[in-house]
Every structure is written in structure tokens, then in C-alpha cells.
Amino acid sequence: MDIAQESLGMAAEETLDPTDWADVQAFSHRIIDDAVDYLREVRERPVWREMPGEVRDLFTAPLPHSPTPLAVVYGEVSRTVMSYPMGNIHPRFWSWYMGSSNFTGALGDFLAAIQGSNLGGGNHAAGLMDGQVVNWCKQMLGFPDSASGTLVSGGSMANIIGLTVARNVKAGVDVREHGVSAIEKPLRFYGSDQIHSCHRKAMEALGLGNRALRRIPTDAGLRINIDALRAAIVEDRAAGFKPACVVGNAGTVNTGAIDDLRALAKLAHEEGLWFHVDGCIGALIAIAPQNAHRVAGIEWADSVALDPHKWLHSPFEVGCALVRDAAAHRRTFAVTPEYLESTPRGLASGEWLHDYGLQTSRGFRALKVWMALKEHGVEKFGRLIDQNIAQVSYLAGLIEAEPSLELAAAPTINIVCFRYQPGLAGEALKALNTEIMLRLQEQGIAALSDTTVHGGHWLRVAITNHRTRRDDLDLLAREVVRLGREITAQGHVSS
């Protein structure tokens, strides 16, 4: 404190910056070294393990009021968060549907946090990079240059963006001004009975309600039945509803089924409906040379939701919404209060990216995607997608070759459902396979999930993992059989 401050009774000014930059630089080197080791040795650790009580108890500690040395803070993080992860970066994590991250993307997230830009808008390099990554997503899916898009938290939000534009375009009234109560005829949205639960949330958030989303039956391959969809549209019009939007699945969450996107695009055009594609699982198959044909027609969509944090393996979180009609996209979200007006030059002369979504403050999500794409090139990511799809076919072959394993159906892309079947049925069979799944997790062998397909209970493997190898799948098949026999012998289930 200088003499003037002291004489005025002023407190010394503080900052969150380190008091010793050399010391924090050396400590940061240690953290980076630990991070490299953490990834390099990922295969040597269990996929997942249960936290002991003393670890859980640490997260009930009260709010800290006084300082703690950074080394102590980092030590606590190492013993807790880093030691008990979800496990999705592990080569044998196939539960739910998650990417496995990548080191370059992690560096991008670190640099984005250091640089600290707010991507709500403005004239700065991060904003331009955000736009460039959106443009790259358009190129990957064959969208026109004139289309727009926005990076968001993930697939659920990307779907909400697309469906909000669809609602406003098809409402026939100014929904932003008058609300959904001003819509003359109730809107109808359509998707298959395999549609992701986020679409229900979207309907509720948009004020339309769950009943506005009509679930259409699927065929034997769990793809939307086009004839049933057409009949539902006719029926709804006759009943006084206004068909507004059809949602096509580029990969369903249960089995990876891909709707006939070309047929849906044609039907939507003929019926005057908005065509939205939920591509959070499979849109990026468009860059995979051996499998791109599976999502043909996605380039005709009015809007698409996709997830770079899945098959581009970006660190969580980053999704992307693309909208063909850029003007409609901006009309749906743009607000220009006096404190966010553009200027002819200076910081506020750049585009306001918040005009394309719900967030005003936005994190710098683009950098982790940009760096990984620049380092590896999009062709490598396409090959990795083909690799995962081939690995699932390999696993399906192992399942078919083992008499005690049963395959639900031939896989479409990178998801396979199967179960251990020693001659049980109903709840006993479900209990056995659930126990197999839990022991695989608890013993740190592999992370699987389970689901219901055609009314039956199945184990589910979703390979969105650039670290998975065929040896891992050999191990999985062996361990499922071993555990199935072990549990049956122990008498934990009965027919």
C-alpha cells in the first residue's frame, strides 16, 4: 500500500493472479506432465470404480472461506476427481453414447479458458473461429454456404434450436410477440417411436406439450414407417391440426437405426413440413468414406443437430445446430437491446453470435474442435468412424459364434445389442444380464448400458471410441460368458 492509500484509509487492492509467476509456471508444468501420463496410462486403469465413503465425504465439506495452497487443492483433485472418473476416455467404455475426447482438444479447452473470450459476439478472433467451425460442420454435411448455425452445449440444445425455428416458421403467427396461444391450429411434430427423449423436453419447453409430438411406428429395422407417417399427417389435418415438422433420425439411441432421410425429405417437401434431422449419433457418418451412403439425404434437411463431442471426440461439451434458412434462424432468436448494439468499428463491430441461440454469454467451444481438425484432418476422423462401425460388426460376429450369447439384430452402424442366454426368459433373464452389466462395471472390465428393443431387455454396446481395439471386444465377449456362467452357478437368478 502506498502512502496516499494508507492516509486515506484505503485497503490494498487484490487480484486472483499468482503472486509468484515463476512458481505457478513450474507447477503448471507438473500438471501438464500428470495429464499426459493420465492419458498415456488410461488402458492400465479400471474403466470405472466405485468411490469409497471418504471420497464422497470430501464433497460434503462446507464453503471454504480462507485460502488453500494450490498444491493442496490440486492434490485433492487428483485423489478424487481424477481417480474416480466416469471412464468414457477408456478404450472399453461403450455405455450410453459418448466420445472419448482427445489430448489436442483438451489443450484447446485449456487455451480457451486462458484466453477467456465470451462468444456472445464482438469483433475478435475467437468469434471468427466459432464461425469457421460452424462452416466446417456445414461442409461435412453438405449444407450450402448460405446456411447458418451455432455451437451449443450438446445435442439436446442443438435439437431445441432447430425445432424452435421450425415452430416459428410454421406457426402462421408471430410467436415471439404473441406466444403459442395465438397459433390458430395446434401444431403437430412427427418422429419415430425410437426418437430421443430430448424431443419431448423440446416440445414442453416450446409450449406445445408432449402431445404435439406424434410418435410414428417403426419397421422391423426400427426405422420410421413412411406409410404410417403419411397416414398420420392426413389424419391430423382432417382432425384440425397443422402438421409442421418431421424429425428424422440419423442414428437412434437404442440401436443406431437410420431413417430413410431421402424419403423423409421428399415427403416433407410434398407436405409443406419442416424437415429436421436429429444427427447427434450419426450425422458425422457423412465424412466416413465407407459408410457415408447411410445418411444420404441429410444434406436436404431444413435443420440438423450434430455433436462434435461424440464422433469428433471433442472434450465435453460442444454440439452444433445447422439451419438452412439463415434469415429464419436469426429471426427466431435475435434481440438487440441498447446495451448490445453494433458499432461501425471497434469491439462491437463484429457479428453478435447470441442472435442465433438462447445464450448471451457463450463459452469458446470452437477452439478444441478447430485444433483437433487442423492437427488430424477430417479424413482421419472419417476413417475412425468407419473403424468403429467395423468393430461393431466384428463384435456381432463374436456374439453369433458363441452359443450362449444372443444378438438382438444385425447392427446398422456402431451400436449392438445382445445378451447372455442360458435358456432363461422374462425377468430372470433380465436380472441375469443386469447383474452381468453391473459386475463388468464394478470389476472395472468394461462399461456397458442396457435398453429395451422389441419389448426385450438387452445389453447395449455403443462404440464411439478411437481407443477401442478388437482385442478389447474379444475380452468383452469372454468376460460376459464368464460372468454369466459364474452368476448362474451362484444361483443369483432362476428361471
Please report, for each region that a protein language model flagged, where it lies by residue.
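PLP-dependent enzyme catalytic core of the Aspartate aminotransferase-like
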Residues: 453-495
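Short loop-beta-helix segment that forms the pyridoxal 5′-phosphate
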Residues: 137-165, 214-217
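Short beta-strand
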Residues: 406-411, 448-453
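Active-site C-terminal subdomain of aminotransferase-like
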Residues: 296-403
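Conserved PLP-binding catalytic core of the aspartate aminotransferase-like
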Residues: 407-440
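Conserved PLP-enzyme active-site core in the AAT-like
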Residues: 125, 158-330
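Short, glycine-/Ser/Thr-/acidic-enriched flexible segments
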Residues: 194-196, 220-221, 251-253, 282, ...
